[in-house]
């Protein structure tokens, strides 16, 4: 079974605010140097939840080489 990450796990992991996390979901507001926006939650709700595998895939392809 995949590990599940919630919003607070991700804000701690990347040392960002919740607002920054949500702004990363748009290609228009993503920082330069990233090739793709942050993935939407696998399970929206309160709290939002992501599969760790979804986050790992994003981490593997997020940076321009």
From Swiss-Prot:
Bias (Basic and acidic residues): 50-65
GO molecular function per UniProt: DNA binding
GO biological process: DNA recombination; provirus excision
Keyword vocabulary terms for this entry: DNA recombination, DNA-binding, Viral genome excision
Region (Disordered): 45-65
Keyword Nucleus: no
Spans traversing the lipid bilayer: none
Keyword DNA-binding attributed: yes
Reported function: Excisionase and integrase are necessary for the excision of prophage from the host genome by site-specific recombination at the att site.
Protein name, as recorded: Excisionase
Organism: Enterobacteria phage phi80
Lineage: Viruses, Duplodnaviria, Heunggongvirae, Uroviricota, Caudoviricetes
